[in-house]
Amino acid sequence: MRFFVSCAKGLEYLLVDEVLALGAAGATATVAGVNVEGGLCDAQRLVLWSRLASRVLWPLAAFACADEDALYAGVAALPWVEHVLPGQTLAVDAHVSGEAITHARYAAQRVKDAVVDTLRDAGVVRPSVDVEHPDVRLNLSLRKGRATLSVDLGGRALHHRGWRQAPHAASLKEHLAAAVLLRAGWAKVYAEGGGLLDPMCGSGTLLIEGALMVADVAPGLSRYADPDAMSHVSVAERPVLLPSRWRGFDVVAWEALVVDAQQRARRGLAELRPVLHGSDIDPRALGAAFANARAAGVQDAIEFVVAGIDVLPAVSEPHGVVVCNAPYDVRLAADPGLYRHLGDALRRVVPRWRAALVCGSSTLAFATGLRADKKYQFFNGALECVLIVCDPVVPLAREAGGAQALSEGAQMAANRLRKNVQRLKKWRIRAGVECYRVYDADLPEYAAAIDVYQEVDGARRLFLHVQEYAAPASIPEGDVRRRRHELLAAVRAVFDVSVAQVALKTRQRGKGGSQYGCFAQRGEFFHVCEHGALLRVNLFDYLDTGLFLDHRPLRGRMAREAVGKRFLNVFCYTGVASVEAAVAGAAATTSVDLSSTYLHWCTDNFALNGQGGVRHRLVQADALAWLEAERGQYDVIFCDPPTFSNSARADDFDVQRDHVRLLRAAVARLTPGGVLYFSNNFRRFRLDVDAVAAFAQCEEISPVTIDLDFSRNTRIHRTWLLWR
């Protein structure tokens, strides 16, 4: 059986590891969650034991849903007497996207109506609504015209642990605290005799989660503890209630899981060493922290001290982990000076320890002055955060000399990069953009385009793609090298990346624009995400990366239009537009390119997303010749030819010379009502409007195909919409 476990964005691959460690047969990451292969007992084990999950959703039905009537009918078709007992309470959570139903609360209401009406018609006492503590919580996901209805086996958001007695401003949610500790390798450090220090502990979330983690206490023991049980009783001894009273819930299996978890908790709490230290300048925050630690049963393992970061608590452990959720949001204003003082204090007091610091941005992370070995991005609610891991705080090779200061020119470039990062941040979060252009020759003396690529799996590293424009012959070679080194130094400083994470290329302009070629031959591919599709990119081995970032909005538009339709992509390159159309729900795709290298790459992209087979055809052919011979019909066609190409296997192609012939052949393949998107990046291109008007209607739509990150270079491509 396949079920879904949701999580905060950025934790997907950590959750895959946890799910597999807890006994699931299989797990595949997707955006903000994991698809899990396993039985009901596996799902209930995750409810009890997962430290990272937000919800565990057990599917009841999936059905086509074109409108509210289809939603009602699909829900009403289920045998609800087998799921809900007479008189139970009910809640429905809904998440909707697309055009079928646009209001989540209305969708939830229709689901509730269908359940209630079905039970009433069966002569069963109707359930009442309890949105806070229902007996049965249902979850509706409505996306791309398809509804999935599930039971929320946990009954509530799993980041709630049950021990939080006193909330505190800007507290890190418990499942995010667990992710920080896992990224920091805290359990291994504890097993080796190390300690844990949080110099800005607030209400104690990181320390309490750290103690419960190494004490082997299941999060569900306190979450579902009987509230009528005496509070002073150990979490390992309190009665544990059912998380859900859904009729399908396996009560016997749950009780066995709880007994085993309680035995492990007794043993772990008895052996827990007092090696956790927390400090905060706010006495009220520490009062909340101690109350929370007492409720969790770990107050004897944590030492709390009122102190600012200038006076870190003394630690006796020779090695350990520093964790910290430094202020960064509107409730606790971010202060780069505070981050700088934090970095100074850690270098002074615990230089040999490992540090895992949650920062609000790369700029704030840079302010610590610490060199990150690893860098991760995740979301704390709607806030995008950066986690840096420094191991150790002060690398041995740098203790004597310290960090190298940026030159005046490099500092100027760094300031511009930081300004651009900040300018794009709200747009990126709102649009879900993870790969973007951050700089495009903003400063004339640093003439380069810089793109950011966010890895979505593994360590979630950042990679930078720096394309240096060839300098005029009048610029001395020494100045060219100096400016190049200054720009690269600025890139590494602002984004806190190693040399190995920066790809540098110099573009040479010729008749056909930049030509493809091989470079480093590192064979280093990694995965990124765009519009919900996983994509394979390589920043080092070719001039281009496998993903043309400037076409991002056009790909999104075509994917939305291709739902349920036939999509054709000629000159398909690595097939990104085809893959995104397939993921969005295209009925079929055809991708044509002459290059076997790119078609193999395209195949890999389809496989990454679980797509392929006869519905998604790949054709190795000269695109123009293939179009003129093809007899199939397509609803949406994408044609993005190169400016110029030559090959031993095909005639030379020149977009200015051949575009009318190309467009005539492509338009002939359109179904009635079909559309063709034609785009190219030849700056001097002139569409032969009169010739095209003989066989198609045409409208230039270039402005709406340029996103904010390419607003400095609005002529990076031009795009026309054609139809018959």
Swiss-Prot record:
PROSITE patterns reported for this sequence: THUMP, UPF0020
Name of a matching Pfam family: RlmL_1st
Keywords: Cytoplasm, Methyltransferase, RNA-binding, rRNA processing, S-adenosyl-L-methionine, Transferase
Listed EC numbers: 2.1.1.173, 2.1.1.264
This protein's GO CC annotations: cytoplasm
Principal localisation: cytoplasm
GO molecular function, one term: rRNA (guanine-N7-)-methyltransferase activity
Catalysed reactions, as listed in the record: guanosine(2445) in 23S rRNA + S-adenosyl-L-methionine = N(2)-methylguanosine(2445) in 23S rRNA + S-adenosyl-L-homocysteine + H(+); guanosine(2069) in 23S rRNA + S-adenosyl-L-methionine = N(2)-methylguanosine(2069) in 23S rRNA + S-adenosyl-L-homocysteine + H(+)
UniProt-listed InterPro entries: 23SrRNA_methyltr_KL, RlmKL-like_Mtase, RlmKL-like_Mtase_CS, RlmL_1st, SAM-dep_methyl-trfase, SAM-dependent_MTases_sf, THUMP_dom
Keyword flag Translocase: no
Intracellular or extracellular location(s): Cytoplasm
Similarity remark: Belongs to the methyltransferase superfamily. RlmKL family.
Described function: Specifically methylates the guanine in position 2445 (m2G2445) and the guanine in position 2069 (m7G2069) of 23S rRNA.
Official protein name in the record: Ribosomal RNA large subunit methyltransferase K/L
Organism of derivation: Xylella fastidiosa (strain Temecula1 / ATCC 700964)
